[in-house]
Curated annotation (Swiss-Prot):
GO molecular function: aminoacyl-tRNA deacylase activity; ATP binding; valine-tRNA ligase activity
Magnesium found in the keyword field: no
A Pfam family per the record: tRNA-synt_1
Residues the entry annotates as binding ATP: 535
Function: Catalyzes the attachment of valine to tRNA(Val). As ValRS can inadvertently accommodate and process structurally similar amino acids such as threonine, to avoid such errors, it has a 'posttransfer' editing activity that hydrolyzes mischarged Thr-tRNA(Val) in a tRNA-dependent manner.
Organism of provenance: Lactiplantibacillus plantarum (strain ATCC BAA-793 / NCIMB 8826 / WCFS1)
The protein's name in its UniProt record: Valine--tRNA ligase
Motif ('KMSKS' region): 532-536
Gene encoding the protein: valS
InterPro entries: aa-tRNA-synth_I_CS, aa-tRNA-synth_Ia, Anticodon_Ia_Val, M/V/L/I-tRNA-synth_anticd-bd, Rossmann-like_a/b/a_fold, tRNA-bd_arm, tRNAsynth_Ia_anticodon-bd, Val-tRNA_synth_C_sf
Recorded GO CC terms: cytosol
Length: 889
């Protein structure tokens, strides 16, 4: 049921009162669900599912605000809209949070066991999913909760299993022993893009590797020199390599050296991998601890010796160092090498070291048996698709190049994770034969099989999000048929390789279509100094705190108005103050309009023949704004749309049209009053509709307080182009009047004269069109410029003593005597003259001092000369002005 209009609006905008209960009302009215109108064009967005690791941050607020603006506008434009909500289980991140919580209680996941630990994670998920939904409500997001999904829902889990099994059967998923990135704190494999490289202090350790043949020397030495940054992996060395084209070391190939500390012989081999220009041109080969060494080892059939446990402590292969942490082992080995005279030197360096994105610990390259996706065929398909009609449109366009570059240089994707929270890999191993079974449902004799304990990378299920949430693999599902592919994805550019790229290749592989028509990539939220917000820096801001102080609409306005595709945005409370002030301006303007509408049922524009110049102008400006906002929204240029709205509302509507309406509304002409009331109501109604996608709460409150038709702005029609409103002449004429009135106000302000004081106003112009405009609209000039006499024409003679403003095709004069007391002006100018004379004398004396000119820096001397010249010019003008005023007085 629609709320009744009211004129009882508080004098000040109170976001808490405005927003209270409104969201629940929208939900009760079922306004966020698709219309179900089969004749309407569908428009769908799936929310990038936030991780259930914790509360939403400002980045989420920005991301979802942009999506809500899009979906609200499309809904108002008559599209059959679906904005599908959901959340991500976020395997490693959520498990790490729960493990940290348990550690505070002195408990590990191993103490609980898999089943009880997973229940703890589900409890965590339920707690934070509830918090996230409360935050969505506070933000005013128009999500269809009847379709809410979670990446570990039964339906989505079925999709995950089907994709895994199908890729396996196609030969695109395989299991093997390879070097992978290993997080020793989470004790799981990581993909390349889950590794963040940071500059760390380290060292090159130059170590002697003695020849096995004690009688052999090379360059007069019984050893070769090997430089390494990781002496802790030495116990896993199985060769030393040189480049086959490196003539310096040809005689060494085939020789053997003694591995220091291990006293084990290893060969010197030739392999093109070695860069002869780097270091000594000789490198140690550790196939179990380096991806490049692993490849070299495969080519030369070298043994793989893993020297670390999964927590990065040393294992039995490390000999006496077994049980030590890797960094403790490094120190111990370095000391032993020094004690045995095997350390030549240590050179400190700063080098790039991989760290886990989630735990921030240094990642290990580790030999491990894992599941992988063979990426080349999938990447090639995605690249080919970008050349056709079904290509994904990247906004900004430059990110398509980043996408292509990543696809062209892609590595196989390690998808298994040694975690407990996530989608269990649908693979089983026969307890007797070791045979592998991969299937959606599992073996029929489960007692003879053991399921792989690992889970899938979080991004594996997230990559299916656009179509799995629509009912796939059931391709006959109504939502899948109507709303897939989705229209727009809005997300941060930082997850282009993690998520966007993977959704594209998985969607193409399993549906034959792109997952979304376009992807809008925004930047990061930074603080007012340009520093990325983070918990560790303590500069993060809770969006709920901002909403509590300023309201959701102000935050949404700031986030949308500061948005330029692909760019970062800086948060500042100064900008939030400005956002609140703008909404307060809208509130007060609306209050004025509503209080002056009388008993109107609904706004109806008067006949065009009854429009005043002000009416014609405001309707033309409104239509220009409608077209500009619609166009910029279609381009996802929210910042430009916001600027257009701000300029029209603040400048055109509030500062001018409302002011022009006041005399009419208080006048005796009933018809003119009714006409102005209707134009005011119509324009305000259109403003509220234009603003609603950005500021849903306050616009709804105001709209329901004024005469209206319909239950909610949520489903009201969005403004459209009215060509009959376009009026270039009215816009030009009003622009001239505004420029004139502004010029008169500037003169008064400069003279510190009252704005309402009556003055002689002279306008000199030989533009006959401009003369006609000013003469035809003397009532506006009288109302806003307050002239006691008005002279307009080409023959207007400028008073000898007047204040002047130049405007387009005209000069504006007001006699000085009408603005100021000439005797007082003389006194003021004489004081200024004395000040300038003193300054000129000071500078002249200083520049006449030869020691100053000779010894002071050149820029200081030049600055003093410039000041003197400037003050001399001002003094001369001041003296002439005094002469003129005294002559007049």
């Amino acid at each position: 049921m629609s709320e009744e209009p009211t004129t009882d609006m508080p004098t000040k905008y109170d976001p808490t009162a405005v927003e209270a209960g409104r969201y629940q009302t929208w939900l009760d009215q079922d306004l966020f669900k698709p219309s179900g109108d089969k004749k309407a064009k569908p428009y769908s967005i799936v929310i990038p599912p936030p991780n259930v690791t914790g509360k939403l941050h400002l980045g989420h607020a920005w991301d979802t605000t942009l999506q809500d603006i899009i979906i609200r506008q499309k809904r108002m434009q008559g599209f059959d809209t679906l904005w599908l909500p959901g959340m991500d289980h976020a395997g490693i991140a959520t498990q790490a949070k729960v493990e940290a919580k348990l550690r505070e209680q002195g408990i590990s996941r191993y103490d609980l066991g898999r089943e009880k630990f997973i229940q703890q994670v589900w409890d965590w998920k339920d707690e934070y999913a509830s918090i996230i939904k409360q935050q969505w409500a506070k933000m005013g997001l128009s999500l269809d909760y009847s379709r809410e999904r979670f990446t570990m829902d039964d339906g989505l889990s079925d999709a995950v299993k089907k994709v895994f099994v199908d890729l396996y059967n196609k030969g695109l998923i395989y299991r093997g022993e390879y070097i992978i990135n290993w997080d020793p704190q989470a004790r799981t494999a990581l993909s390349d893009i889950e590794v963040i490289h940071k500059d760390d202090k380290g060292a090159f350790y130059h170590v002697k590797y003695p020849f096995a043949d004690k009688d052999y020397t090379f360059n007069g030495k019984h050893y070769i020199e090997i430089a390494t940054t990781r002496p802790e992996t030495m116990m896993g060395d199985t060769a030393v390599a040189v480049n086959p084209s490196d003539d310096r070391y040809k005689e060494l190939v085939g020789k053997k050296v003694i591995l220091p500390l291990a006293e084990r012989e290893i060969p010197i081999i030739a392999d093109a991998y070695v860069d002869p220009e780097f270091g000594t041109g000789m490198v140690k080969i550790t196939p179990a601890h380096d991806p490049n060494d692993f490849k070299v080892g495969n080519r030369h059939d070298l043994k793989r010796i893993n020297t670390m446990n999964d927590d990065a402590s040393m294992n039995a292969n490390a000999g006496k160092y077994e049980g030590m942490d890797r960094f403790e082992a490094r120190k111990a080995m370095v000391k032993d090498l020094e004690d045995q005279d095997l350390m030549i030197k240590i050179d400190p360096i700063v080098h790039s070291v991989g760290h886990s994105e989630r735990t921030d610990v240094q990642v290990e390259a580790r030999l491990s048996t894992q599941w992988f996706v063979k990426m080349k065929p999938l990447a090639e398909q995605a690249l080919k698709n970008q050349e056709g009609d079904d290509a994904v449109d990247f906004i900004p366009k430059r990110f398509e190049d980043a996408f292509k570059q990543w696809m062209e240089n892609i590595h196989d994707w390690v998808i298994s994770r040694q975690l407990w929270w996530g989608h269990r890999i649908p693979a089983w191993y026969n307890k007797t034969t070791g045979e592998t079974y991969v299937g959606v449902d599992g073996p029929k004799d489960p007692e003879n099989w053991e399921q792989d304990p690992d889970v899938l990378d979080t991004w594996f299920s997230s990559a299916l999000w656009p179509f799995s949430t629509m009912g796939w693999p059931n391709t006959d599902a109504e939502d899948f048929k109507r709303y897939f592919p989705t229209n727009t994805l809005v997300t941060g550019y930082d997850i282009l390789p993690f998520w966007v790229s993977r959704m594209i290749f998985q969607s193409l592989e399993f549906t034959g279509r792109r997952p979304f028509k376009n992807v809008l990539l925004h930047g990061l939220i930074r603080d007012e100094h340009g520093v990325k917000m983070s918990k560790s820096l303590g500069n993060g801001i809770d969006p709920m705190d901002v909403i509590e102080k300023y309201g959701a609409d102000a935050l949404r306005w700031f986030l949308s108005n500061g948005s330029t595709a692909g760019q970062d945005v800086r948060f500042s409370y100064t900008k939030m103050d400005a956002a609140w002030n703008f909404i307060n301006k809208i509130w007060n303007a609306s209050r004025y309009v509503i209080m002056n509408l009388g008993t109107m049922d609904k706004p109806e524009l008067p006949a065009a023949s009854d429009w005043t110049l002000a009416d014609k102008w405001i309707l033309s400006r409104l239509n220009a704004t409608v077209k500009q906002v619609t166009t910029t929204f279609d381009k996802f240029d929210f910042g430009e749309a916001g600027r257009a709205l701000y300029n029209f509302i603040w400048n055109d509507f509030c500062d001018w049209y409302i002011e022009m309406s006041k005399e009419v509304l208080t006048g005796d002409d009933a018809q003119a009053k009714a006409n102005t009331q209707n134009v005011l109501a119509y324009v305000l109604d259109q403003i509220l509709r234009l603003l609603h996608p950005i500021m849903p709460f306050v616009t709804e409150k105001i709209w329901l307080s004024m005469p209206h038709v319909g239950e909610s702005l949520v489903v009201a029609a969005y403004p459209v182009d009215h060509p009959e409103f376009d009026d270039e002449t009215a816009e030009s004429d009003m622009a001239s009047l505004i420029e004139l009135i502004t010029a008169v106000r500037s003169i008064r302000a400069e003279a510190n004269a009252k704005m309402s004081s009556a003055v002689d106003l002279l306008i000199k112009t030989d533009n006959t069109r401009l003369q006609a405009v000013f003469k035809a609209n003397e009532d506006y000039i009288q109302r806003f410029a307050h002239p006691k006499t008005l002279s307009i024409g080409a023959d207007v003679v400028a008073p000898k003593l007047a204040m002047t403003q130049v405007i387009s095709d005209a000069e504006v004069y007001i006699p000085l005597a009408e603005l100021v007391d000439l005797d007082e002006e003389v006194k003021k100018l004489e004081k200024e003259q004395a000040k300038f004379e003193s300054e000129v004398a000071r500078a002249t004396k200083k520049l006449g001092n030869e020691r100053f000119v000779a010894n002071a820096p050149e820029d200081v001397v030049n600055s003093e000369k410039e000041k003197l010249a400037d003050n001399q010019t001002k003094l001369a003008a001041l003296k002439q002005r005094l002469v003129d005023i005294k002559a007049e007085a």
